[in-house]
Regions:
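Positively charged n-region of N-terminal signal peptides that target proteins for export
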Residues: 1-4
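A mature extracytoplasmic/lumenal domain signature
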Residues: 50, 60-61, 97, 105-109, ...
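Surface-exposed, charged secondary-structure patches
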Residues: 70-115
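A short gly/proline-enriched turn/hairpin at secondary-structure junctions
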Residues: 55-65
Length: 150
């Protein structure tokens, strides 16, 4: 019995050690989590939300980020634009399969006084290759402060 309990405890510890906050999230839930960790300026959590290689198509310019050590979002650049926080106005799952989803996200960015700086609709391709949803690519029709492009 002691060996069984010890084995069970080790299994729980190992599964917790490899757990990701987005493990049980739906594609829509991932988008809410994404904006939450962005607002928290939690760079490690943000990087874990992205799948690498990561693709961005912003205002017609394609950027590929291969290295997960390179931040996808430039928080300092975002702050220089006056950004303090973002909110989601609408999330729509346009298509979803077992390991892929296409999301339409309408969001706003605000300054510290609550003034809306930007309202935009952006499209996200999600993948579940690692067992949990991640953002594989972002497609934006306009330029976005804080979004790295080469």
């Amino acid at each position: 019995m002691k060996q069984f309990l010890l084995g069970l405890l080790l299994t729980l510890i190992m599964s917790t050690a490899t757990a990701h906050p987005q493990d049980n999230l739906t594609p829509e839930g991932l988008m809410h989590y994404y904006v939450q960790v962005l607002n928290d300026e939690n760079l490690p959590a943000l990087q874990d939300v992205y799948h690498f290689p990561h693709l961005k198509l912003v205002a017609g310019k394609l950027t590929v980020i291969d290295d997960p050590k390179i931040p996808v979002i430039d928080i300092d650049g975002l702050k220089k634009s006056g950004w303090k926080y973002s909110t989601i106005k609408n999330v729509k799952v346009l298509s979803q399969g077992d390991n892929a989803a296409l999301i339409e996200l309408n969001f706003s960015r605000f300054d510290a006084q609550g003034k809306e700086l930007l309202n935009q609709t952006t499209f996200y391709n999600l993948t579940k290759n690692k067992g949990y949803w991640q953002i594989l690519s972002i497609h934006s029709m306009g330029s976005l402060a804080g979004v790295k492009t080469k």
